[in-house]
Amino acid sequence: MVEDVAIVGYLPGEAGRYIADLVRAHVPAVPVRRPHITFMPGRPPALPDAELLRRLRQRAQNFLPLELTLGEVRNFLPLSPVLYLDVVAGMAGLDQLRRVLLEATENSHPERFPFHPHLTLAYDQSPEEILALQPRLQAGWAKYPGPRRLRFTQLMLVRQTGPASWQDLGSAAMPGME
């Protein structure tokens, strides 16, 4: 069985650490993955990993770092029991990046849900648990003292290795990476 591949951007610095700690404190039953924004959701690969990574690195050279702003804690109910931080600014750059990523990976698989950029906070919970968690996570996020506008300088190709498990396959730097 071939596992899905996806392209993500890990949250940089203090924001990533804060969100991981926030999730760990309020959703201990769910394994905490490294906080990230998904730029291309998981789908079966159309090309070998080495070729996907080569193309990703080649295309990333044409992009400036992506600046996205995180908003409030929201949920996808009733469609899906997921809590997330909304991406509220930076969509034009993200849409352009997504088009290039889809072309570069030669992937025409339809997405399960319409693409809505976000940072997942909680999943695999009942709708009631999601609704109970939402105000607590929002209160915790409201206390974050840092900037909500984050600069992404790297793309990461990842492979799904289990139901909630992903492995980094390689990164691609966008210009301006330190």
Regions found by a protein language model. Name each.
Residues R74-Y84:
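Short, basic/glycine-rich phosphate-binding loops at helix/coil junctions
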Residues M1-T69, N75, V87-G146, P163-E178:
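Basic, often amphipathic N-terminal segments
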Residues T153-G162:
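Short beta-strand segments and strand-loop junctions that repeat across beta-rich extracellular domains
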Residues L85-V87, L157:
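Short beta-strand element of the conserved SAM-dependent methyltransferase core
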Residues L150:
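Short, surface-exposed ligand- or partner-binding patches at beta-edge/loop junctions that are enriched
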